[in-house]
Structure formats: C-alpha cells, structure tokens
C-alpha cells in the first residue's frame, strides 16, 4: 500500500479530551475518529489492526470446535422479560420502540437470543454439545463513556455460547475455551493473566477473566509469586498474615474522642496504630427493615461483592443512611463498634485475630481502646469480607500475593441453567426424559484488545506494535523518491516484499514532506520494521534498517534485505 493511495490521517497534537494513552495515540495515529460520546469511526489504519485480532479469534474459535453465527443487534423485549433481565439490567440497556410500539433493545449481550435459537433448533441430546459464536457490534449505554475504546458505548465483541446435557460436558468445553483464549492472547503477543472471577450480572456459578497487564488498567489483578493462583480483586480470597491472636496486654477503657470522625483522625490524633483500628460498616440486611454490621480492619477495604453474597445481607449491597444509624444505634458512622451493638455482626478473618484494638463505643465522640475478643465481647460470625492487599499469603499456601493493574479483555462463564430454565430450553435426554440444558458463555472485547495492546506497548514517539498486530509489518521510506535511482530501487523492493507476502506501507509522499516527518509518522503509527532507501545508501549497495524498539539503525546490503526480513518478521 502506498501512502498516496491511503488515508494517512496522523495528527501532531493530542486532543484535549483524550486521557488514556491508547485513546490519545489511536486518534493521533489516524486509527479512529470520535463521532459522539462513546462512539467512534474506525479508519483504515485502525481497522487493519482490528481485523487481525478478529482473524486470530476466528481461527482459534474454529479450532476449538465453535460454529460461527450472526445474530441481530436489535432484540425483542419479550426475550429479556422471559429471562427477568428487562428490568434487572438497568439504564445501560438501550430500549426503543418500533413503529408498532413494540419494545426492543440494542443488544449488550446475546444470552437470550442464543437460548431462544437453541430451544427452537435443538431437540435431542445427540445434537450436543453445541458451541456457537459471533463477532458483532454491541451497545451499552454507559452513563459516562470515557477512555476512548476502553469504555465506549458501542464496541466490537466476540461472544460464544455453548449448550450441554450435563455438567461434565460443560466443563470439558469450558476448559477448551480457556485454552483457546490463552492461545489467542499468546498469538497476539500480549502479556496477560487468566484469573478467577465473580460472575456479575451475567450470572452463573464459575468464571475466569483474562486481563492484559498494564499500569493504566482499571482492575486489580491478583496472583501468587510462587504458583499459578490468580484472581481478580472481587474474587481473591483474603488470608490473614497472622496465624493466632495475641494475649491481651491492655485494659478496656472508654475514651473521649471528639476529633476522631475517621480512621485517619483516630490514628493521627490518638496515637492508635491503624492495624489496631476497625471500620464498622452498617448495611441493609436481606430481611426487610433489618441492618447488619460488617467489620474490617482500619487499614483494609470492604469487598462489596463478597459482602453481598452473605445470606444476611441485601444484594446489591446498600449502606445504611445516617438516619437509619441514628434510629437503630443512636450514634453516627464515625463512632460505631461491635461492643453493645444491637445488630448482628459479621467480622473479617483479620479482625478475629486482633487484640488490644480500638472501636467506636456507639456513642458520639467516644471510643473503646484496649478491646479484646472473648474477654470484652464474644467473637461473632467470621467471614472473608475484605479486599486482599499485596503481601498477603496466597490462598493455595504457596507464596504471597502480588497485585498488578490489568485491562479485562476476555471473560468466560459457566452459566449453568440460569437462562435455559428461564426460557425453557431443553432436549430429550438419553433416557428419553426432558433435560434442561447447561450453558457456557465466552466473551472477548475485540476492539478493547486493540486499545489494551497499545496501553501495554508504547513510548514517547507513539505506538509499538508487535508483528502480529501491526497494521503494516514494514514501513518503506524512500528519501528523494522523485529521483530515478531511488524511485526505481524503491519500487523494485516494494514489489519483491509484497510478492513475498509482507504487508508494506510505502511512504511515497513528495519532497514537501520531510524525512523527519515521515519517520515520526511511521513511529507514531507503530510499524515495527522500517527500511529507508536513499541515494547515498544505494551508492554503497546498502539500505537502512531499524526496528521500532531499537535506538539505532543499521546498514543492510540490498541483496540481503529479503532474507533478513524473512528471518526477522514474525508471520
């Protein structure tokens, strides 16, 4: 491809509303253009990258035995009402009416549609297992679209759904898809981690997320430094570093604390070590009108996903209002604690191992210091309530936990029978009796992968693509292309490289475009291999080669270029 026949839409300045690197560089490199909030047009340069992601995804899905389909973006409300998600999904679901006033939505996901397809097409266990996928545009009406493609409203996604007569078959396909996802992200040259995850709004019983590691990531990815254990922050089990509770050394005492509305103030103004403090958080209970106290150490954070799974706690988690606290306890949020608290208490594992600690006295501006379990109050129910912190013991007993930032690019679920039961999707089993199908669900954010790859690999000059993802593998840059000797050598090399199967972008812009601008554009776009053709080099029988990640260029004999690139470029 020649730049004279291509839309080379690079920009020198960074748009003011672009915050994250991938958004900035995709705009500057001429890969996307913003149409409206959260909506982007893919330009030819960006689309080449996305098509490469799609190709790898398609190859690995096909190799794993999945069958490609294409479902409508617009879905009838009746299906979502059958599953119960029409109201549950919330305002992110874009709803609309047709001219006949029938309700529809723009699909953010396709569990209902695929289950409807399966219940109409499948009748016997002999047709199972069946795994179908599509690569299609999705829409979620995000309240605050941001970060370019990382959190847009419209995006490209690969979603697959599998159907099974039993759990063993589901597990087999799930494991196959887990491996397929690992193959995909490995082939794309990404540094990634598969982690145990919560199933979230999709539902189901078992899931894994696939995260590309990047400092700009929105999610915490937790993994052991000595084993294969890995989980996201919602799922990671928090194991206390302490193994036993120390014996009491202090007496219980009531202290006036007018300057301790927060943990930070309690530590700063009263000299209490933060690991000797607790947070008493009051939430609404599962039973109407009931409140429940959740207690974590002062230097730890409540994990709301874990808390909402407790049978006594309302899901989703809702914090009690100040008025509710006053009515139930008679004190404000900064003065609460488990001693003499007229509510059911659930404490974190780390709290159960504390001694000589401080708590709110359930009286405004008063705290108890020197509190000890069993001596001053009984140990209530103990549960895993907190987020892990770096250095915690790994739950598998091997090593300690490391926390990195990650960008979620894939998620696989074992849905079980959640949707098949709701939509009555069943077949005749081997014994001739109806069997409700078990389902799996497997998603990859195709457009998000492109942005995540940039977040993982860039420098101050622009994007650094690997060979698998680059829009073009080779940038061929002639200097003084208007001269016969340079033009003839360049055109001949371009023809040879193209015939050999390389993806080449020939920068044939005229002399009004300086060599510096040409080099800067190719580095901004991130093309991994650059060949420079100049009359001076040709006089010596050489070309100039430079890899995008290298500082210095090297002379390359003209007659060795093809052999060199065939060995260097990964195809």
Curated annotation (Swiss-Prot):
Its EC number is 6.1.1.15. The keyword Aminoacyl-tRNA synthetase applies. GO terms for molecular function: aminoacyl-tRNA deacylase activity; ATP binding; proline-tRNA ligase activity. Pfam families: HGTP_anticodon, tRNA-synt_2b, tRNA_edit. One of its GO terms (cellular component) is cytosol. Keywords: Aminoacyl-tRNA synthetase, ATP-binding, Cytoplasm, Ligase, Nucleotide-binding, Protein biosynthesis. InterPro entries: aa-tRNA-synt_IIb, aa-tRNA-synth_II, aa-tRNA-synth_II/BPL/LPL, Anticodon-bd, Anticodon-bd_dom_sf, Pro-tRNA-ligase_IIa, Pro-tRNA-synth_IIa_bac-type, Pro-tRNA-Synthase_IIa_type1. One of its GO terms (biological process) is prolyl-tRNA aminoacylation. PROSITE patterns: AA_TRNA_LIGASE_II. It is found in: Cytoplasm. It is an enzyme of class 6 (ligase). It catalyses: tRNA(Pro) + L-proline + ATP = L-prolyl-tRNA(Pro) + AMP + diphosphate. Homodimer. Belongs to the class-II aminoacyl-tRNA synthetase family. ProS type 1 subfamily. Catalyzes the attachment of proline to tRNA(Pro) in a two-step reaction: proline is first activated by ATP to form Pro-AMP and then transferred to the acceptor end of tRNA(Pro). As ProRS can inadvertently accommodate and process non-cognate amino acids such as alanine and cysteine, to avoid such errors it has two additional distinct editing activities against alanine. One activity is designated as 'pretransfer' editing and involves the tRNA(Pro)-independent hydrolysis of activated Ala-AMP. Consists of three domains: the N-terminal catalytic domain, the editing domain and the C-terminal anticodon-binding domain. This is Proline--tRNA ligase. The lineage of its organism: Bacteria, Pseudomonadati, Pseudomonadota, Gammaproteobacteria, Pseudomonadales.
């Amino acid at each position: 491809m020649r730049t004279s026949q291509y839309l080379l839409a690079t920009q020198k300045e960074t748009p003011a509303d672009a915050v994250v690197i991938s958004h900035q560089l995709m705009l500057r490199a001429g890969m996307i253009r913003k149409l409206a909030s959260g909506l982007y047009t893919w330009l030819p340069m960006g689309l080449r990258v996305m098509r490469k992601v799609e190709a790898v995804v398609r190859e690995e899905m096909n190799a794993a035995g999945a069958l490609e389909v294409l479902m409508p973006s617009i879905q009838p409300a009746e299906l979502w009402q059958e599953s119960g998600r029409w109201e549950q999904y919330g305002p992110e679901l874009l709803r609309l009416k047709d001219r006949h006033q029938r309700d529809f939505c723009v699909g953010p996901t396709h569990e209902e549609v695929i289950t409807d397809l399966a219940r109409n097409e499948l009748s016997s266990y002999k047709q199972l297992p069946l795994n179908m996928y599509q690569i299609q545009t999705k829409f979620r009406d995000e309240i605050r679209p941001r970060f370019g493609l990382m959190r847009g409203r419209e995006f490209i996604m690969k979603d697959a759904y599998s159907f099974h007569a039993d759990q063993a078959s589901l597990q087999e396909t799930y494991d196959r898809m887990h491996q397929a996802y690992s193959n995909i992200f490995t082939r794309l040259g990404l540094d990634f981690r598969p982690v145990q995850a919560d199933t979230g709004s999709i539902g189901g019983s078992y899931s894994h997320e696939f995260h590309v590691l990047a400092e700009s990531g929105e999610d915490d990815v937790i993994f052991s430094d000595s084993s294969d254990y890995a989980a996201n922050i919602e799922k990671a089990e928090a194991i206390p570093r302490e193994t036993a509770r120390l014996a009491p050394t202090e007496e219980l005492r009531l202290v006036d604390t007018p300057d301790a509305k927060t943990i930070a103030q309690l530590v700063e103004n009263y000299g209490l070590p933060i690991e000797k403090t607790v947070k008493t958080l009051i939430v609404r209970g599962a039973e109407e009108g009931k409140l429940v106290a959740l207690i974590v150490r002062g230097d730890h954070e409540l994990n709301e996903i874990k808390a909402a799974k407790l049978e006594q706690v309302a899901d989703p988690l809702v914090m009690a209002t100040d008025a509710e606290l006053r009515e139930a306890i008679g004190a404000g949020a900064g003065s609460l604690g488990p001693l003499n608290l007229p509510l059911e208490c659930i404490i974190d594992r780390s709290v159960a191992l504390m001694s000589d600690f401080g708590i709110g006295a359930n009286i405004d501006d008063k705290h108890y210091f020197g509190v000890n379990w069993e001596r001053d109050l009984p140990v209530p129910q103990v549960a895993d309530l907190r987020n892990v912190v770096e250095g915690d013991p790994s739950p598998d007993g091997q090593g300690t936990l490391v926390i990195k930032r990650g960008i979620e690019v894939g998620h696989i679920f074992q849905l079980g029978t959640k949707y098949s039961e709701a939509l009555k999707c069943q077949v005749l089993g081997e014994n001739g009796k109806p069997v409700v199908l078990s389902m799996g669900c497997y998603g990859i954010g195709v457009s998000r992968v492109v942005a995540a790859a940039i977040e993982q690999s860039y420098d101050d000059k622009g994007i650094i693509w690997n060979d698998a993802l680059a829009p073009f593998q080779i940038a061929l840059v002639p200097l003084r292309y208007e001269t016969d000797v340079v033009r003839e050598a360049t055109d001949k090399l371009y023809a040879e490289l193209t015939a050999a199967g390389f993806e080449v972008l020939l920068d044939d812009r005229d002399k009004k475009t300086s060599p510096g601008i040409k080099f800067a554009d190719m580095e901004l776009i991130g093309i991994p291999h650059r060949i420079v053709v100049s009359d001076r080099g040709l006089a010596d029988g050489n070309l100039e080669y430079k890899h995008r990640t290298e500082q210095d260029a090297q002379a390359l004999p003209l007659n060795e270029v093809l052999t060199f690139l065939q060995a260097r470029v990964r195809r």
